[in-house]
Amino acid sequence: MIVNGTEKSALLLMAIGSDQAGEILKHLTPFEVQELITAMVNIKRVSAQKLNEILLQCYNLAIKNNAFNCNNSDKYLIKMLTKALGEKKGTSLLKEALEIRNARICIKALNYMKAKQVAFLLDKEHPQIITTILICLNKNQSAEVLSFLSDKKRAEIILRIVDFHGIEESSLVELTQVINNLLKNKKLILSEKGGIKTAAQILNSMKIKHEKEIIENISKSNEQLADKIIKEIFLFENLVDLDDKYIKILLENIEKEKLHIALQNTSQAIREKFFKNMSHTESNELTLNLEKKSYISDISIKNEQKLILIMLKSIVENGRISLKNLREYYV
């Protein structure tokens, strides 16, 4: 929508042709020219009714008909500016105006991304950059993006928004470069790759002490979620991917009865993981015991499997069984 005199003037210049427009621009100040060019590159479609209203206000021009070609193509604008300011200055001015327009488009595009993805993209940036981008977005999108950031960061950004006093157009171009560099250099995969399984995999790679602290903190606010993560962490089936050297250390330190209980109702792949790291005699004996019908409860099986997982985690961390780590294992 055309709302001010600058936009009306820009529309008129696009209507009269590049030659006449260029002559008019020669009589304007550099600041006025820049204002008009910025308005031109941002003008969208105009209805015939609105166009007539604007052109009728230009009483000193002869209006021949209602037809109008809103010509704000780069080719038209550069031709007009070259006539008015010369090739070098005209090209430079148009380039600056187009950069600002493209910057607005780039930042506006973040409104159509999932808020969670935008938050992930911006999370490691300086709070002032995050603040500036959020101010440029739709308020609902900004609020949702903010909800995915940490409590501390949210508070800091709100304080910065309160103290925000505007942004120069040239800074919009810099913001666009920041966004493009994030996408290009970090090669972020903005897809749904989170979830309990991913969280469990990350926790599995941490030391037991830190893993336990995180689980306890999650449990304080969401006990049900903490339980789901714990169940995913303690998947006995994951042992098939573990290095055999750790399995061998485990077998040297675990009671045969506990191993027998833990291997109840497991897949052949899991059993083979242990069999191949045992002597032929031991593996045959364990195989025969597992083939016998047993009445071991599921709880007992899960507890022994959990103990083995903690022992293995301790071995991976320390190269040996740690009694301290065993005392810390989840009950």
Curated annotation (Swiss-Prot):
Marked site (Part of the EHPQR-motif) residue numbers: 160
Keyword Cell membrane listed: yes
Keyword tRNA-binding among record annotations: no
GO MF annotations in UniProt: cytoskeletal motor activity
Tree of life domain: Bacteria
GO BP terms, alphabetized: bacterial-type flagellum-dependent cell motility; chemotaxis
Gene Ontology CC entries for this record: bacterial-type flagellum basal body; plasma membrane
Membrane topology: Peripheral membrane protein
Sequence motif Part of the EHPQR-motif, residues: 125-128
Subcellular location: Cell inner membrane; Bacterial flagellum basal body
InterPro entries, A to Z: Flg_Motor_Flig (IPR000090), Flg_Motor_Flig_C (IPR023087), FliG_a-hlx (IPR011002), FliG_M (IPR032779), FliG_N (IPR028263)
SS bonds (residue pairs): none
Keywords: Bacterial flagellum, Cell inner membrane, Cell membrane, Chemotaxis, Flagellar rotation, Membrane
Pfam families: FliG_C (PF01706), FliG_M (PF14841), FliG_N (PF14842)
PANTHER family linked: FLAGELLAR MOTOR SWITCH PROTEIN FLIG (PTHR30534:SF0)
Chain's role: FliG is one of three proteins (FliG, FliN, FliM) that forms the rotor-mounted switch complex (C ring), located at the base of the basal body. This complex interacts with the CheY and CheZ chemotaxis proteins, in addition to contacting components of the motor that determine the direction of flagellar rotation.
Protein family membership: Belongs to the FliG family.
Name of this chain's protein: Flagellar motor switch protein FliG
Organism of provenance: Buchnera aphidicola subsp. Acyrthosiphon pisum (strain APS) (Acyrthosiphon pisum symbiotic bacterium)
Gene from which the chain derives: fliG
